[in-house]
Amino acid sequence: MRKDIHPEYQEVLFHDTNADVFFLTRSTAKTKATREYEGKEYPYYPLDISSASHPFYTGEQRKTSNEGRVASFNKRFGAFGGRSKAKKTDAE
């Protein structure tokens, strides 16, 4: 087997920002952010949604505070309209 081809498998602190719940588990997720949890420093990975806030697992519907990328883009640039058709002149 070749050496040094596998990603580092380490303990990572995941944070569901909507439910404000922390999960400590092992993962290969890469992140530069760190956070202290129960007296130890762990790599920190924020999540928009997890089993703690997903309607399928919680059994309740609630709106998440974060918008998706497409909705955010449309909110910022939706007023521009998009493609416009070229106007025909009477000279044709």
Swiss-Prot record:
Keywords of this entry: Ribonucleoprotein, Ribosomal protein
GO BP terms in the entry: translation
Statement: the UniProt record of this protein carries the keyword Ribonucleoprotein: yes
Top-level taxonomic group: Bacteria
InterPro entries named in the record: Ribosomal_bL28/bL31-like_sf (IPR034704), Ribosomal_bL31 (IPR002150), Ribosomal_bL31_B (IPR027493), Ribosomal_bL31_sf (IPR042105)
One GO CC term on file: ribosome
GO molecular function, one term: structural constituent of ribosome
HAMAP family xref list: Ribosomal_bL31_2
Quaternary structure and interacting proteins, as annotated: Part of the 50S ribosomal subunit.
Similarity section: Belongs to the bacterial ribosomal protein bL31 family. Type B subfamily.
Protein name: Large ribosomal subunit protein bL31B
Organism (species): Psychrobacter sp. (strain PRwf-1)
